[in-house]
Swiss-Prot record:
Name of the protein: Elongator complex protein 3
Tagged with keyword Endoplasmic reticulum: no
Keywords on record: 4Fe-4S, Acyltransferase, Cytoplasm, Iron, Iron-sulfur, Isopeptide bond, Metal-binding, Nucleus, Repeat, RNA-binding, S-adenosyl-L-methionine, Transferase, tRNA processing, tRNA-binding, Ubl conjugation
Residue ranges constituting the N-acetyltransferase domain according to the UniProt record: 405-557
Co-factor remark: Binds 1 [4Fe-4S] cluster. The cluster is coordinated with 3 cysteines and an exchangeable S-adenosyl-L-methionine. The cluster is required for structural integrity of the elongator complex, while it is not required for catalytic activity.
Organism: Saccharomyces cerevisiae (strain ATCC 204508 / S288c) (Baker's yeast)
Domain Radical SAM core: residue ranges: 91-381
């Protein structure tokens, strides 16, 4: 009897469950990766290509993420494959994993005496952007992580360290950057609790005492090699500097924004440019590395005045900081500047003019200064007027190439960055010395470089402090020279291990310290040399004969 209503038989193979196919896909990708190691091929691994190929093969609804691939790699291969796979290798190309954290939202301290916040400043408790900190919108990656963690420092730090670890980065050395308004204007109890939790997040200690937390952090496997605190000149007095030294802070980021007194007054900064110069000098004489924030394209400035102020910044010894963040002015809703823009009293530079300006600024940068950032992390849809492109530094460097100029700042020349972007390795490395006068003191910038390829491997900043601004008893009791920074670049190499292809832990740091000691003794006439050291690096200096001296590591010479 014939069957009715039945179609022709199909050979369609029934698919295995999604989870099973997902595991099989990860296994196949891992097999290809391990095969590339054992076969000895030197070709680059195209991980995205492999993920697309096998996701198609197994008809997956969702592709595996990098963390899924890393988790499926056998332990014996991880050591060799992780450096090739890590997401955003620039994150640790400078030799340190930077972890940004935010303090709780609070009002700007200068409202009390100026009556309002700066005209360009978004965010804060009274802004359109609820639950965001001062000068942030709440939509930057760091802000969103902070909001998810309800501004709990422990949760923020732990979460970010784990995230970097999952993405294949070495988190052996961590530097905290403390953002979110003027941290030093918050109550002392809150500040100390915040810092304790940051140290505890690395060491696993759960006490509340700051000195104890720092002792445990010193011995932790994940070392805190430095803390950066954002502040203002009026919250950078000797008392504030002493507190920050106690926290383990090694670098200050000071908001300057403009070198013109009239612009500082009109934008409602709440401090003078003269106070900025004094802050730089006192901070450097206390051993800190100093980075400042500058904003081109502010109201009533114009292109010529902008270029002039950056020339002044790099040439005038009263400024000349170790680092700089260039933040072109952005018009964001809810700010005083937005009202000026809306009524036609403020107009931003065109995109082309801004690229031109940044290119001209970068051409002025001396080789001892590091340009940390060239624009804010604020998402483009929130920007009403200002920067149109998310890759301003890249565009400016391309413009410089067209104009026949080069950027010789520290970041552009770092060996790790050169490796990531240009696959360039140094050949002949030699010690180079540059001396300059800044903020009342004699600065010596020592570095190991390949002068032919213009690649920087390591640097040391040595200072003979000024008599006028030195106030710390560790420095006034006898003639002292200060090492404000020692940094060997190249991708992070875990402490206690060596990788002959990387530049960390190859002895460059020790050689730089030996030369600094010689200069301090023979040229400065110092009896002692002190280092401002991150909590987790104190043991390194201990091996070089240094002893704890207040918050510093010191040695008689």
């Amino acid at each position: 009897m014939a069957r009715h209503g039945k179609g022709p038989k199909t050979n369609k193979k029934k698919l295995a469950p999604e989870k099973e196919r997902f595991i099989q896909c990860c296994a196949d990708i891992t097999l290809e990766l391990t095969d590339s190691l054992t076969s000895g091929t030197t070709r680059e691994i195209n991980l995205n290509g492999l993920i697309t190929k096998y996701s198609k093969k197994y008809k997956l609804k969702q592709q595996p993420r990098l963390t899924d691939i890393i988790n499926s790699i056998p332990d014996q291969y991880k050591k060799y494959l992780l450096p090739k796979l890590k997401a955003k290798p620039v994150r640790t190309a400078s030799g340190i994993a930077v972890v940004a954290v935010m303090c709780k939202p609070h009002r700007c301290p200068h409202i009390a005496y100026t009556g309002n916040i700066c005209v360009y400043c978004p965010g804060g408790p009274d802004s359109d952007f609820e639950y965001s900190t001062q000068s942030y919108t709440g939509y930057e990656p760091t802000s969103m992580r902070a909001i998810r963690a309800r501004y709990d420092p422990y949760e923020q730090a732990r979460g970010r360290v784990e995230q970097l670890k999952q993405l294949g980065h070495s988190i052996d050395k961590v530097e905290y950057v403390l953002m979110g308004g003027t941290f030093m204007s918050l109550p002392k109890e809150y500040r100390e609790d915040f810092i304790v939790k940051l140290h505890n997040a690395l060491s696993g200690f759960n006490g509340n005492d700051i000195d104890e937390a720092i002792l445990y952090s010193q011995q932790s496997l994940t070392k805190c090699v430095g803390i950066t605190i954002e502040t203002r000149p009026d919250y950078c007095t000797q008392t504030h500097l002493d507190d920050m030294l106690k926290y383990g802070c090694t670098r200050l980021e000071i908001g300057v924004q403009s070198l013109y007194e009239d612009v500082a007054r009109d934008t409602n900064r709440g401090h003078t440019v003269r106070s900025v110069c004094e802050t730089f000098a006192v901070s450097k004489d206390a051993g800190y590395k100093v980075v400042s924030h500058m904003m081109p394209d502010l109201p009533n400035v114009g292109m010529e005045r902008d270029i002039e102020q950056f020339k002044e910044y790099f040439e005038n010894p009263d400024f000349r900081t170790d680092g700089l963040k260039i933040y072109p002015t952005l018009v964001i809703r809810g700010t005083g500047l937005y009202e000026l823009w809306k009524t036609g009293r403020y107009k931003s530079y065109s995109a082309n003019a801004l690229v031109d300006l940044v290119a001209r600024i970068l051409a002025l940068v001396p080789p001892w200064t590091r340009i940390y950032r060239v624009q804010r992390d604020i998402p483009m849809p929130l920007v009403t007027s200002g920067v149109d492109n998310g890759n301003l530094r890249e565009l400016a460097l391309a413009r410089m190439k067209d104009l026949g100029t080069t950027c010789r700042d520290v970041r552009t020349r770092e060996v790790g960055i050169q490796e990531v972007h240009h696959k360039v390795q140094p050949d002949q490395v030699e010690l180079i010395r540059r001396d300059y006068y800044a903020n009342g003191g004699w600065e010596t910038f020592l570095s190991y470089e390949d002068p032919k390829k213009d690649i920087l491997i390591g640097l040391l900043r040595l200072r003979k402090a000024s008599k006028k601004y030195t106030y710390r008893k560790e420095f006034t009791s006898q003639r002292t020279s200060i090492v404000r920074e020692l940094h060997v670049y190249g991708s992070v190499v875990p402490l206690h291990s060596r990788d002959p292809r990387k530049f960390q832990h190859q002895g460059f740091g020790t050689l730089l310290m030996e030369e600094a000691e010689r200069i301090a003794k023979e040229e400065h006439g110092s009896e002692k040399i002190s280092v401002i050291s991150g909590v987790g690096v104190r043991n390194y200096y201990g091996k070089l004969g240094y002893e704890l001296d207040g918050p510093y590591m010191s040695k008689r010479i």
